[in-house]
A protein has these predicted regions:
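N-terminal glycine-rich phosphate/adenylate-binding segment common to multiple enzyme folds
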Residues: 69-101, 105-108
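Short coil/turn segments at secondary-structure boundaries
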Residues: 58-65, 89-96, 125-126
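Hydrophobic residues in alpha-helical segments
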Residues: 53-54, 78, 142, 175
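Anion (oxyanion) recognition and catalysis
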Residues: 20, 79, 113
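Mixed-charge interfacial surface used for oligomerization/domain docking
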Residues: 3, 11-19, 24-25, 30, ...
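N-terminal glycine-rich anion-binding loop in soluble enzyme alpha/beta folds
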Residues: 5-71
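Glycine/charged-rich beta-loop-alpha catalytic/anionic-binding loops adjacent to active sites
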Residues: 55, 83-87, 111-122, 264
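Short glycine-aspartate micro-motif
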Residues: 5-7, 85-87, 267
């Protein structure tokens, strides 16, 4: 009989109650800010971390989960009699974490040469709840008796459709992470120009620029409507850093899409370390790529 573990990392932004409900293991990233090392989901709440970023002199940096840490986790699964682990780390193109998991599989063969653990390593091609939600869906379906091959195929199909539109209201972190140029960040702050950014298949792109904070939400919603036109299984989620504009986005999306979001969720430390502490995100199901 199969015994299946589901493993992800704290970039998934899965709420703790859902992780506990579905038995999902979440390994935490370390985030360094002003020489203080924070362990995501342990050291402070998301809201506390936003405030620390707003008050900080420097820019946060994140450390990938190491091959040794992954190997130790895999060994734990072997020792506990698991037959399979579905491992969904952060987007491969944005972190060395995925490659570290690949290295850990080689280390496991050395540590437990006769092990029979099947490791299903999946690249979500995205960040945060756009994959975290569907990790929960995999776990739910497995609990209801679905075949592991079926839930993996469904997950990968869904990841080929997920798109994110970001609306950052402060640009310091975006500049540091390279998502916008230093010149664009300076001009944006001086003139109130806000970039509308997509994150699709692990890649970011500035799709538009609007002048004034009040133009951000309408531009985000219009872009999502345009890109998702004709999608039969359309749904959406809203991410935020607990700023007032999240309510404007929820209201605008309800009007535009005629339904409530699947979930409204706070952006975690790893994600907000790159987007900044004043960001809203519209996640939606687009066309298959």
């Amino acid at each position: 009989m199969s015994k299946i573990a589901i493993l992800t990392d704290s970039s998934c932004d899965i709420p703790q109650e859902l992780a506990e409900k579905y038995g999902i293991d979440i390994m935490s990233f370390h985030i360094l800010l002003d020489d203080v090392d924070y362990i995501e989901r342990e050291s402070c709440t998301n809201e506390e971390f936003y405030e620390k970023m707003r008050a900080a002199k420097g820019i946060p940096s994140t450390a990938a989960i190491t091959p040794i840490q992954f190997c130790e986790k895999y060994c734990q699964y072997v020792d506990e009699g698991y037959t399979d682990v579905i491992h969904v780390p952060i987007n491969r193109s944005g972190s060395s974490t995925y490659n570290n998991a690949v290295m850990a599989q080689g280390m496991l063969r050395e540590e437990r040469p006769e092990h029979h653990l099947r490791i299903h390593l999946l690249d979500p091609h995205t960040y945060s709840m756009p994959f975290g939600w569907y990790v929960c869906e995999m776990a739910r379906k497995l609990q209801n008796g679905a075949e592991i091959s079926h839930v993996i195929q469904e997950f990968e199909t869904q990841m080929d459709k997920m798109e994110i539109v970001l609306g950052p209201y402060s640009l310091k972190q975006m500049k540091k992470s390279g998502r916008i140029s230093a010149a664009a960040a300076v001009m944006g702050e001086l003139m109130g120009i806000r970039p509308i950014i997509t994150l699709i298949d692990g890649k970011t792109k500035v799709e538009a620029k609007v002048r004034g904070d009040d133009k951000v939400v309408p531009a985000m919603v219009e872009l999502a409507k345009k890109r998702s036109e004709g999608v039969e299984d359309f749904d959406y989620m809203i991410g935020h850093t607990n700023i007032p504009q999240k309510d404007d986005l929820i209201k605008a999306c309800r009007k535009a899409f005629g339904r409530d979001p699947l979930i409204t969720f706070p952006l975690g430390g790893v994600v907000s370390a790159n987007t900044g502490p004043d960001t809203i995100a519209l996640v939606y199901v687009g066309h298959a790529r």
